[in-house]
């Protein structure tokens, strides 16, 4: 294989489009010159020819169409390259794509003296024309294939060719990779004999921007002879995607009175086209402003950044003078750097003029009047204010303060959150007899502080005159409750105390009468004129109406007003205990086995309704007048309990044992209670008392039998 010159290699690497049949040597479709040079002028002038390009598809150039990599240039039908506007910098390289139904090709225009700029299509090529290409020991020569997206029928369409100068006779080309035998399968194919590469369908750069294919040569059996060699297919972007605003809704806020040039918000659109080209180079503008007052141009948008800023004087951003403190802007984003040929997308930006506290609240009048009955509490008057600020903010919400006339803290004022009114309330009942008139000084402020150049004036204070109305108040007992201590069982008719009630309405000189309101046991009476309370029955500390030795009664004091007013007083009578209750024993029934080894019968307890010292220690005894000493025994356990036991076993029967118990009062109280003892048959852990009733014996008979037994023993 002979070494190739650099020029030959450069030509092969730049070959990217259709090459006609090798038999057709008279006409080669494509540009006659693949690389052209242009000296960078001071400025490219609009509509001034730059150079002429020659393209021939060998079929008459029917429906010839040109595309230029820069939106600032175009190629006329005669092949003349012209600028669309005056421009100074276009980069180092331009690419011109020519296409007819029969052929297409790409020409490179090198700008001598040009500088790199963002967006040059040179970046999409994976090989550098200014760098030497490393020499490789292979005969397969491939160049990147450039295919514009969105091509139309007919398909398949030849897009490039692979050259193998040393390919053995009978060998074939084979193409593999993504888009051939990998998804999306069948997009590309190669003529196994000629090496022509074709595309079978429309490509979409936004779906797949590049395809990495591999070329190799095989023999007739499919065995690889050379390769695989990478073949890159680059999809050239077309401006087929509109800018889209994807982050809405767009809502911005700006404070009223903000200086000119205040940034409100940023609008950002997205374009799916190639960001390295002008197809995705966006420019922003405001298409419409609603409302259009006080100026149709309240805002400006930076065409490149999308920042929306204010452009009017601070005085025009006065929320209180605007018909509507909310503006809606239709924002348009246009690609192709804003040229008329660019695609557009729109979105709505809502801008709210926020309120600041530049208006102080003012009372609607300087003086307010209110009346309230003495003794009443609650709201007595609503104080109204005006404030021009936004009702949804702390710049409008009012805060009221009583700054004078409330030494006893009888009044409070709160803000009604719905109306912003000040609700003045009485929280401690007023007394007409003490003061019939009150004057309060009220101050109103906002929750938020005022701006520095605004202050609270005289209109931010108001005077409230309050008139207290006299009402007939009920008499008041003093003291309340009234307390007295008496011994229970005092004689009927005893005087307990004299109650006293006074009328708060001292200026009315009313008389007071007394009556009983509640006397649960019916023990008391009261003199209606002088309030003397005496007993009508015996007081009993042990009564169910007495709780913790205290008896409670209620009395009424009624004045002579029209209508009369009533006051209630409570009498608490503490009853001292006397020994008027005898103790009682428990239990009163017991069982014992007739053959019991343990002769204990029962443990007795005693209780007494009285209090110490009229209760325990109790004294337990067997009433000896009716019971023999040698049968029963009672023993003291403690102050409240005793043990009853047998001295010998008894026959199965029921026995009544009289128990006498005495308390410790002075004088003491005694009670005798029969203890019923059942002597039962106990066999095999079973207790049988059923037959005991049939042998019921009184203790007197038991005594008789005991005496006979003693006599017979003599």
UniProtKB/Swiss-Prot annotation:
Q: Which residues are glycosylated?
A: 382, 489, 500, 530, 598, 638, 671
Q: Which InterPro entries match?
A: Cadherin (IPR039808), Cadherin-like_dom (IPR002126), Cadherin-like_sf (IPR015919), Cadherin_CS (IPR020894), Cadherin_pro_dom (IPR014868)
- N-terminal signal peptide: 1-22
* Ranges where the Cadherin domain occurs: 143-245, 246-363, 364-477, 478-585, 586-680
User: GO BP, one example?
Assistant: Rho protein signal transduction
Q: Where is this region: Disordered?
A: 156-183
What are this entry's molecular-function GO terms? adiponectin binding; cadherin binding; calcium ion binding; identical protein binding; low-density lipoprotein particle binding
**Which residues are listed under lipidation as GPI-anchor amidated glycine?**
693
Subcellular localization is given as: Cell membrane; Cytoplasm
Q: Its GO CC terms?
A: caveola; external side of plasma membrane; extracellular space; GABA-ergic synapse; neuron projection; perinuclear region of cytoplasm; plasma membrane
Q: Which UniProt keywords apply?
A: Calcium, Cell adhesion, Cell membrane, Cleavage on pair of basic residues, Cytoplasm, Glycoprotein, GPI-anchor, Lipoprotein, Membrane, Metal-binding, Repeat, Signal
Membrane topology category: Lipid-anchor; GPI-anchor
Question: Where does this protein have compositionally biased stretches of type Basic and acidic residues?
Answer: 158-172
Q: Which residues form the propeptide?
A: 23-138, 694-714
Q: What is known of its domains?
A: Three calcium ions are usually bound at the interface of each cadherin domain and rigidify the connections, imparting a strong curvature to the full-length ectodomain.
Q: What is this protein called?
A: Cadherin-13
The species this protein belongs to is Mus musculus
Q: Which gene encodes it?
A: Cdh13
